[in-house]
């Protein structure tokens, strides 16, 4: 339990998954811009159909380092002032940072290249800041100082302020990248299927789906039938940007594997008991025996109908996570074929799509990264259109060699006037998340629920699976064993059970780091990797090495490799987010460094069969989870993939020498979430009681914000005399200043059947002393469309000369709150029905 206390002392522990991912996103903005540089524009063809002029445009110069991030400001009465988060709330502004960039032009005229970098920067746009992130003014500010700035002492941040409204980006649950998924009953023609969505490492190429399908027929006379009663026929491959499925052997020959024997060996790698199932596929590729003919065949089904475009598809679009080498893609395609064959013949089960081994969670930073990338790509396309439009307006002038540079140097500010990236992000926060109709998501950005402090934190820790309401599927709603320790098992969300989940207390979402770091460490420790092009039939017994879904090669000493890499992670040589697992059944070593993996902390049993935990090593949570050469970490994080190959004990033992345990749980409370840990004796209650406790505690009247007096919320309910519960969870200690109830002494009169469900008798003096006394706040807001109207409101005792009700005015149904004038007519704003009280504040 001491370790859990150390975790609770960490700043921002409730929303670190948002803060860390947003900080990572901001650091990656220069990389996003760099990957899409340069923008090339060609002009003025000569007689030989060759362009004489060319201009290459680099945003942020050639290194993308000339980017300036500006602080948030606003203008009042012509004076520019710094913008603080609470000012943004009160003034209905967006709390943002700006980006300015220098532009480098490389202008080529008849082979002569000149380079220009104007001093004046272009404005790329204003982009929302996550509160308490590294670029926020509240970052690392003490609670009392935050309180003086209008913030809550206990508010962890992790949300945005858009037009004065607090917005939260909900974590989205989705399929893992570069992961093969097998399926039965794919279609009437293709019963068995294996598909993969490939993402390139540089992020420049958009993700593409590739698939292997097996055609089947119901042939009762066949002696070779699967357990599903169907006969396997030809295998085909679905390629990106190719209209029809292509026979497997044609694709293999296009990738450079020519003979039937080589193709079968590439697929099976010595597992010869599946050879008979390739007969139909061999016949399906009759007449195409060379790489050239195979590329021509594939090209005929593309929009350009060319061999060159077929090469482009295979090199850049098909299995882009495998790099540019065609032979590597051939081996990976063979691996997919073998996987779908083993599934079809009942050797392996169908892929479990609901397992978190095959899922990732995208926090706010990852979602913003993808949205920024897509809209920035659109903005560059728009810049190209603007350049063409400016050129066509005065084509003869700009076609002169001396005038061509002025097309760019004199007009480059106009090219970036349309801030598509900024507008796209703001539109996403207001409901339409996604740059295209294919990437749009519903409900990603939502208004932060400020009904209570508990509801706000639960909203920030929610994870959503996008599922169509019309889909009558049950499996995604069930509690999956791979979710153990990653999600709260008792905090369900009513009708959205299973699709709306709450992160457990200590779980985190990985940020990701380049996989090259793992390869560098393996090279440094001389852990040999056999490249794919060196594999032979005899290599079937070697252990495959997959790194972020990419088949890197094979290794001869898996035990040594596994031990070395795990020790490197525990000693800080590799990041603690690295996942290393050896699946002996699949004869594969999986290593993951990508973002979006859910991890949870555990003690581990070291190679000496000693538990990593010892009271003498207690320190800060960061110190216990990060090790060095001299002192390995005491706690390590595991994801669902690594947990699948581990044996985890629930209680620490005195001696682990006679056990097979690899890890031990830290404490039972780490399995529950924010609300589950506030439920008392959760392990002794039936599930409905725990579920009701989580749901109803979120809706309890409370002090939702310690600085509610300085806010103008649309609606707010405050418990005036809240109390700390007599029986409380240790987890409640950091939030005692935000009570959500009162300690009531209840007597139940059960003698005659009169029960609490019938009625409650209150002690009058308790109510008079303030028991359950609450304050309800309602904000009325109007916008002034024209500030030049000289009318001064007079003749009303409630409103001032600006037409706004005065503070401390008693409010009744006929009280005028605001008076609005248009011409000679005046419109009065009255309170809603049955709302009475006093004016607390005007702004």
What would you call each of these model-derived segments?
Residues 175-177, 182-184, 504-505, 511-519, ...:
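Short, compositionally biased
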Residues 138-148, 458-488, 720-735, 795-808, ...:
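Flexible, glycine/threonine-enriched loop-and-boundary segments that flank and lead into catalytic domains
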Residues 163, 171, 428, 436-445, ...:
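Generic beta-strand/beta-sheet core signal
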Residues 154-175, 359, 477-514, 738-740, ...:
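Conserved phosphate/anionic-ligand binding catalytic regions in large, soluble enzymes, centered on
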Residues 749-787:
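Carboxylate/His-rich catalytic cores and anion/metal-binding grooves
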Residues 1-449, 464, 504-507, 511-688, ...:
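N-terminal non-catalytic structural scaffold regions of very large proteins
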Residues 143-144, 520, 782-798:
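Short, basic/aromatic beta-hairpin or loop at an interaction surface
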């Amino acid at each position: 339990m001491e370790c859990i206390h150390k975790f609770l002392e960490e700043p921002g522990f409730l929303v670190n998954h948002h803060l860390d991912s947003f900080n990572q996103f901001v650091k990656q903005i220069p990389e996003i811009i760099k990957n899409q540089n340069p923008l090339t524009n060609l002009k003025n063809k000569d007689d030989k159909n060759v362009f004489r002029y060319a201009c290459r445009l680099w945003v942020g110069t050639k290194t993308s380092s000339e980017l300036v991030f500006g602080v948030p400001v606003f203008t009042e009465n012509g004076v520019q002032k710094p913008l603080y988060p609470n000012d943004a709330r009160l003034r209905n502004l967006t709390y943002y940072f700006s980006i300015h960039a220098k532009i480098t032009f490389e202008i080529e005229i008849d082979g002569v290249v000149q380079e220009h970098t104007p001093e004046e920067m272009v404005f790329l746009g204003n982009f929302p800041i996550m509160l308490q992130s590294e670029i926020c003014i509240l970052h690392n500010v003490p609670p009392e100082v935050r309180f003086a700035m209008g913030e809550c002492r206990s508010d962890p941040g992790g949300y945005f302020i858009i037009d004065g409204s607090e917005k939260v980006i909900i974590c989205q649950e989705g399929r893992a990248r570069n992961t093969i998924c097998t399926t039965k009953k794919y279609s009437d023609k293709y019963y068995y299927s294996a598909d993969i969505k490939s993402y390139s490492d540089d992020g420049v190429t958009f993700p593409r789906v590739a698939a292997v399908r097996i055609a089947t027929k119901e042939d009762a006379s066949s002696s070779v039938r699967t357990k599903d009663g169907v006969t396997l026929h030809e295998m085909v491959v679905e390629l990106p940007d190719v209209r029809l499925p292509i026979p497997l052997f044609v694709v293999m020959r296009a990738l450079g594997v020519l003979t039937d024997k080589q193709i079968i060996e590439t697929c099976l790698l010595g597992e010869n008991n599946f050879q008979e199932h390739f007969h139909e596929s061999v016949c399906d590729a009759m007449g195409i025996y060379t790489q050239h003919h195979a590329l021509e065949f594939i090209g005929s089904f593309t929009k350009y109908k060319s061999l060159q475009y077929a090469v482009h598809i295979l090199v850049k679009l098909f299995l882009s996570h495998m790099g540019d080498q065609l032979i590597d893609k051939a081996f990976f395609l063979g691996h997919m074929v073998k996987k779908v064959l083993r599934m079809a013949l009942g050797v392996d089960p169908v892929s479990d799509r609901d397992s978190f081994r095959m899922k990732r969670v995208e926090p706010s930073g990852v979602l913003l990264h993808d949205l920024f990338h897509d809209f920035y790509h659109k903005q560059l396309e728009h810049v190209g259109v603007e350049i063409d439009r400016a050129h066509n307006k005065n084509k003869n002038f700009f076609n002169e060699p001396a005038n061509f540079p002025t097309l760019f140097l004199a007009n480059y500010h106009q090219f970036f006037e349309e801030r598509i990236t900024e507008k796209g992000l703001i539109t996403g926060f207001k409901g339409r998340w996604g740059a295209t109709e294919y990437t749009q998501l519903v409900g990603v950005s939502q208004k932060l629920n400020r009904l209570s402090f508990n509801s706000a934190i639960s909203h920030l820790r929610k994870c959503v699976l996008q599922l169509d309401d019309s889909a009558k599927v049950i499996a995604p709603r069930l509690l999956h064993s791979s979710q153990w320790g990653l999600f709260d098992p008792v905090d369900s969300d009513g009708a959205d059970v299973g699709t709306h989940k709450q992160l457990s207390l200590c779980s985190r979402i990985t940020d990701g780091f380049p996989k090259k770091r793992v390869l560098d460490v393996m090279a440094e420790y001389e852990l040999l990797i056999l490249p794919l092009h060196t594999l032979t039939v005899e290599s079937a017994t070697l252990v495959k090495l997959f790194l972020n879904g990419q088949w890197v090669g094979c290794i001869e000493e898996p035990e040594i490799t596994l031990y070395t890499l795990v020790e490197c992670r525990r000693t800080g040589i590799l990041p603690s987010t690295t996942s290393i697992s050896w699946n002996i059944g699949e004869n594969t070593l999986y290593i993951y460094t990508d973002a979006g993996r859910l991890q949870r902390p555990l003690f581990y049993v070291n190679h000496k069969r000693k538990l990593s935990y010892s009271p003498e090593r207690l320190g800060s949570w960061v110190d216990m989870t990060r090790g060095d050469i001299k002192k390995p970490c005491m706690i390590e994080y595991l994801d669902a993939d690594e947990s699948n190959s581990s044996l985890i004990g629930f209680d620490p033992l005195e001696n682990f020498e006679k056990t097979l345990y690899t890890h031990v749980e830290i404490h039972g409370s780490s399995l529950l979430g924010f609300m589950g840990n506030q439920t008392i004796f959760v392990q002794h209650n039936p599930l409905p009681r725990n579920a009701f406790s989580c749901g109803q505690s979120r809706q309890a009247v409370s002090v939702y914000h310690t600085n509610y007096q300085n806010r103008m919320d649309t609606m707010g309910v405050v418990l005036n005399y809240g109390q700390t519960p007599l029986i409380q969870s240790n987890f409640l200690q950091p939030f005692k200043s935000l009570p959500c109830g009162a300690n009531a002494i209840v007597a139940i009169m059960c003698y005659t059947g009169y029960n609490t469900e019938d009625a409650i008798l209150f002690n009058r003096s308790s109510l008079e002393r303030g028991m359950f006394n609450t304050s309800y706040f309602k904000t009325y807001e109007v916008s002034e469309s024209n500030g030049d109207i000289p009318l001064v409101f007079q003749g009303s005792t409630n409103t001032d000369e600006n037409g706004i009700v005065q503070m401390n005015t008693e409010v009744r149904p006929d009280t005028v709150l605001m008076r609005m004038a248009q011409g000679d007519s005046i419109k009065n704003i009255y309170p809603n029905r049955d709302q009475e009280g006093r004016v607390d504040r005007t702004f």
